[in-house]
Amino acid sequence: MQKLKEIRTRFAPSPTGYLHIGGARTALFSWLYARHHQGKFVLRIEDTDQLRSTEESTRAILDAMTWLGLNWDEGPVFQAERVDIHRAMIRKLVDEDKAYYCTCTPDELEEKRKRALAEGRKPKYDGTCREKKLPPSPGTVVRFRCPQTGITVVDDLIKGKISFNNEELDDLIIQRSDGYPTYNFAVVVDDAQMGISHVIRGDDHVNNTPRQILLYQALGYDIPHFGHVPMILGADKARLSKRHGATSVMAYKDMGYLPEALVNYLVRLGWSHGDQEIFSLDELIALFGLESIGKSAAVFNPEKLLWLNQHYIKTYPEDRLLEVLQPFWKQLGIEAPDPDYGRSIVRDLRARAKTLVDMAESSTFYFNDEPAIDADAAKKFLTPEIAGHLEAIAEALATLGDYSKEGIEIFLRSLVEARAIKLKTIAQPLRIALTGKTVSPGLDDIMLTLGKERVIARIQRTVAYIRSGMAS
């Protein structure tokens, strides 16, 4: 068996649903630990639950991992393809009298469980078949012969030392009556044979760990290091679930979050480096360590994630932001714009946008030469006297030579001075003429991006709209 020298971590999801926030954080921590130590990150799909495992879920998990940028060095390895190996190792334990066949029925076990609870005892298999030396037969399970004395110590890299009395541990089932290995057995064989040196997983697995350590010892395997990550809670301090909002990684993609924002947020759910909030992936790889993961549960804060997403939208490479916007425009029926026009739109909108959905939805006026005018805004701002001011703007623009951002700013200031009005008098009417609404990027930015011809045409259309009486 391979000695545990190289750092090798793994992520081993069950393909029974989508990749959720908790699993993604576990994968991220395992990935970062491997990358920090120049080790290997292995992806294993634990698909031995034949009834619940689906190809669709497997694809969704792989897509989510890829979107987050968590590339794997080996795999995906499918656990179901290794069942013959698991069965061979179970036979080895039976042959060595470290496991035995059990014929106790589920009804009998349930009755014993109820009796133990009624008598104030912790439910535990009573060893009925432990010394019977039963042969294999249809419907039997295989149980591991757990030591009945001594203490098993888990030297957890996050939680510290945890001790378990062996007498409190069951003779756990390692092969079900259908012939398939149980989770606790298959995971030990797979981790050992794949040379996994560090098992980083959620703390709901803490109680599995002493049983797994005993299995490692019985099979003659090196025992890996374990690190159990505290769970993620909602704002109400209950375990994170759908009632707290989206929990699927790809749901956040669909809502317009950037993968860098989600990765940055997930790593801060339990891990910290001083007061630093924003980390590049290279920084995370350089700084990450299990010793900086807190022992208490982390609370999921959607507002903080939104703040991070807004930061990344502001700082994302322009061409990359234009690229990731395309699917959201497509959903709105908007064709991909000319690259130069698209970049200008991105520059206009990125400062205010919190998500890519926000960005796409607030950009529609750039693609519609007759943007729908908000009725309430029209009633408030598009008064008859405004028509004259807008008409003057359109006429003066036609002869404007310097149609740059600075030139537009000077033009607007000069025009309001000449007409003895304040800029705010025409700012909102002009904004409505160009966009149909009262909230948008700066006027000079919009005018520069739309171009002189579009701006003049939209102003003239709005003047006609006012004089037709439609604004009142």
Swiss-Prot record:
CDD domains documented for this protein: GluRS_core
CC cofactor: Zn(2+)
Cofactor binding annotation: Binds 1 zinc ion per subunit.
Pfam families found in the cross-reference section: Anticodon_2, tRNA-synt_1c
Residues that bind Zn(2+): C102, C104, C129, E131
Catalysed conversion reaction: tRNA(Glu) + L-glutamate + ATP = L-glutamyl-tRNA(Glu) + AMP + diphosphate
Subcellular location(s) per record: Cytoplasm
GO molecular function: ATP binding; glutamate-tRNA ligase activity; tRNA binding; zinc ion binding
Keyword Disulfide bond applies: no
Keywords, alphabetical: Aminoacyl-tRNA synthetase, ATP-binding, Cytoplasm, Ligase, Metal-binding, Nucleotide-binding, Protein biosynthesis, Zinc
Residues the record lists as binding ATP: K242
One cellular component (GO) term of this entry: cytosol
Keyword Nucleotide-binding: yes
Family the entry assigns: Belongs to the class-I aminoacyl-tRNA synthetase family. Glutamate--tRNA ligase type 1 subfamily.
Protein name: Glutamate--tRNA ligase 1
Organism: Syntrophus aciditrophicus (strain SB)
Lineage of the species this protein comes from: Bacteria, Pseudomonadati, Thermodesulfobacteriota, Syntrophia, Syntrophales
